[in-house]
Every structure is written in structure tokens, then in C-alpha cells.
């Protein structure tokens, strides 16, 4: 259902794995403008981010130490440009989680450039 709206994948964890509740990553299609998505989510008082961008090889310490450059790991770079993290924590209520998902879906279904 979400693929039509530009969500390419939502991570599903095996039943024998326990989620860390630190980040909930959603992979978006290239047609989604994640900066605009973040602005619209903030209007709903929902903070999203993308902490893994830039990827490790483009972090200043690695660029300085090893001379890594943009384009050296194209798949990693593309993946980092297309993910967002939805809010998640140990004490999130079901009501809060449903609100986050509901607003996320609404924004993606809206007409316009998201």
C-alpha cells in the first residue's frame, strides 16, 4: 500500500530479534523530497530525521584521514539520500505511534511535491 505513495521499504524484524527502539528507518523513493516531508511532519509536531547522512566514508574524519570522496561508494550515498527515521522510543504509546503513521501516510498521499 505504501509503495504507491513513495515508501519503498519498511524494515521488518524477525520474531527472534528485539528492536533497539533507537531508530525506525523508512526507505523512500527518489520522487519524495525528504526536506519537504520533514517540514510537513514538523507542522504536525512530528520530528523526523536522517542521522546516517552523510555516509561514514564522507564524514570529515574519514575524508581527512583516507581521502575518501563523493562517488566512491555510490550505493551507500544513494541509500543515505533516500531514508528517513520516524520517531520511536521505549515508552511510545500506541496512540502516539498510530498518530505518527497516520500523519505520515496522509502527507505522502497529499497532492503536490513531497
Regions found by a protein language model. Give the residues of each.
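PLP-dependent aminotransferase class I/II
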Residues: 1-114
